[in-house]
Structure formats: C-alpha cells, structure tokens
C-alpha cells in the first residue's frame, strides 16, 4: 500500500492548488492520500474523489469532529537530536480505536542495518513505515520494507517533508517487479501545481534532463540497446529521449539528430558537421541548440543547391 503525504506540506498553498494536487495524485497508482485538518477544511466543499484518506490530527477530539476517514494519525514534532532511531505511533479508525501502527524512521539508519528489524516488525502485525531521508536512503528503505513483506509506506512527491519520493518508490517497485505499472506515469500536473519546489534537471524520474544524452558512445549504445543506459523507457514517465549536441558528441549523435528532425539534404558530410558542432560548442561553452543545429545543416548541406532541400517535420527555423 502506497500512501502519499504531499498535501500535508501544502498548508500555505491556496485551496485551488491543494485541490489540483489532490486530483493529480488520484491519477497515480497510490492507495491512500494523507492530509492535515487545515488542508481538509480548505477543500472539503469541493467534490473529493473516491479514495482512502488518512487525516493528520492534533488530538483525539479531531477524530470526533472529522468522521469518515480511513485512518487518523496524530501530528508530532520530530526531535532530530533524540537518541531514538524511530518513533512508533498509533493509527486510529473512525471510532477512535487503535487500528494499526506507524513507525517513523528518524535516525541515520541504512538499509543493511534495518533488514532484520523489518522482519521483526512485520511479524508483529499491521504496520505503516514512514522512512525519512536523512542519509538519502528513504527510497531504498521503502523498497526493502515492501520487498520483505511490509504492508504500507508513506511517501511524498519529490521527497517533501524529507520523505521517500513518491515518484522514485513507484518506479522502483515497477522495475523490480513488485508492483508493475498498468499505464505510464504522468507527473506534469504535479510539477505544475508544486511550482515552488525546485526540481533538479537530473532528479530521478521527474527531472527534465534525465533522458538527455550527449556522449557519442552513449548515443550509439542507446540506439543499439536502450536498456544498457536506461532502466526504463522514457515513455513510461511521459518523457522522451533527447540527444544533446556538444563537444562530447560523436557521429552517431549527428546521425540521430538528423533523423529526429527528418533533415534530408542529399549527401550530408556528417563528419564535417560534427567538427563544426564541436567547435561551436567549445566556443560557446555550452551545448548547441536544436535551432542552431538545423540552421547549421541548412547552411552546410544545402547552400548553393536548389535541388538540395531540407524537410522539417517537427521544426521550422523561418
């Protein structure tokens, strides 16, 4: 069971943003959505989609005031300086009775040290694991917990609240065969709503540049066997592979880029184009843009010949 707690960290967002995030989350293969009382009060008048909801409350009186949730869990202040490695919480049902447990891993613990402990917890009943990402192992802890037979994990989009990133957990479960995706993941709406989150271009799963490749040998390898360099196809996350042209590019990169834009100029000297691309990239101290490449090919491959004609299927420099 995958629980997403992204909304718990959007209390200062507008009600519209909170609702849009909720709707975007329901399009992903998650099993429950957790939110705070503040967020719920903001969106309660809107039509909430059918879903299991967990409410993060301040005290037991909130359980009486907000009936109908799948579970309730009390908000806590985590003391990072505590000697404890984890905190155990009770999860309540709508009648206020203890129904499950949650363990928040708060210390700098690694997967290697937790496997045996996970097995012990699993034998002791229904348990939700909330691994925090203090040493960049939250995703690994979440995956290992579920692989060992754990029931549920708490995640958040892009690791909000120092949680295991939702997108990384979903993709890890897919590539390891624990929980296969039935359709591609689309995080575009989540990224739009969470516009104040700084997402690195190389952030796993959702980074804009994770399928960008420049090195000639890598481009050649991807053309022959994408699985050598990509753990999953870009289409699985609603993305596309992008060849970047720069001083690390090779002949395969030029050929692939020509094919990408359906550039037809008779006999094209790809070696000459590659030399110019590398020099231009070196002079500019950056990769050259697709527009610059198309103009370059037009200048080199078609100048002075009426018979040579560039066909732009995706692009037009005019």
PLM feature segments, named:
Residues 4-8, 22-26, 184-318:
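A mid-to-C-terminal "edge-of-domain" accessory segment
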Residues 32-113:
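Active-site beta->alpha loop and helix N-cap motifs at the rims of alpha/beta catalytic domains
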Residues 110-228:
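Catalytic alpha/beta core domains of metabolic enzymes, predominantly
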Residues 3-5, 29-37, 150:
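Divalent metal-dependent hydrolysis catalytic cores, especially in the metallo-beta-lactamase
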Residues 10, 35, 104-107, 129-134, ...:
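Glycine- and other small-residue-rich loops at beta-strand/loop junctions that grip anionic moieties
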Residues 1-15, 115-128:
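N-terminal small/glycine-rich loop or linker at the start of catalytic domains
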Residues 17-31:
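Alpha-helical scaffold segments that flank or form the walls of functional sites
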């Amino acid at each position: 069971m995958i629980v997403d707690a992204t909304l718990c960290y959007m209390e200062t967002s507008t009600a519209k943003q909170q609702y849009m995030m909720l709707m975007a989350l329901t399009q992903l293969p998650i099993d429950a959505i957790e939110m705070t009382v503040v967020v719920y009060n903001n969106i309660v008048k809107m039509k909430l989609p059918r879903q299991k909801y967990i409410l993060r409350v301040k005290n037991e009186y909130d359980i009486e005031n907000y009936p109908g949730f799948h579970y309730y869990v009390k908000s806590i202040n985590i003391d990072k300086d505590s000697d404890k490695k984890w905190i155990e919480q009770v999860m309540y049902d709508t009648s206020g009775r203890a129904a499950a447990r949650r363990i928040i891993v708060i210390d700098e613990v690694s997967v290697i040290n937790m496997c045996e402990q996970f097995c012990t917890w699993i034998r002791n009943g229904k348990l939700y694991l909330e691994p925090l990402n203090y040493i960049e192992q939250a995703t690994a802890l979440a995956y290992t917990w579920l692989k060992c037979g754990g029931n549920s994990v708490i995640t958040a989009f892009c690791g909000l609240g120092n949680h295991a990133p939702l997108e990384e957990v979903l993709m890890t479960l897919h590539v390891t065969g624990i929980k296969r995706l039935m359709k591609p993941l689309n995080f575009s709406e989540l990224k739009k709503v969470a516009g104040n989150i700084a997402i690195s271009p190389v952030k796993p799963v959702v980074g804009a540049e994770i399928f960008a490749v420049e090195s000639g040998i890598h481009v050649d390898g991807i053309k022959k066997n994408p699985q050598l360099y990509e753990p999953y196809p870009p289409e699985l996350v609603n993305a596309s592979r992008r060849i970047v042209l720069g001083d690390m590019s090779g002949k395969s990169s030029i050929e692939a880029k020509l094919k990408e834009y359906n550039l037809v100029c008779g006999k094209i000297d790809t070696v000459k184009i590659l030399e110019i691309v590398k020099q231009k990239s070196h002079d500019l101290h950056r990769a050259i843009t697709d527009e610059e490449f198309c103009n370059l090919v037009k200048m080199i491959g078609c100048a002075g010949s009426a018979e040579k004609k560039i066909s732009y299927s995706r692009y037009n420099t005019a």
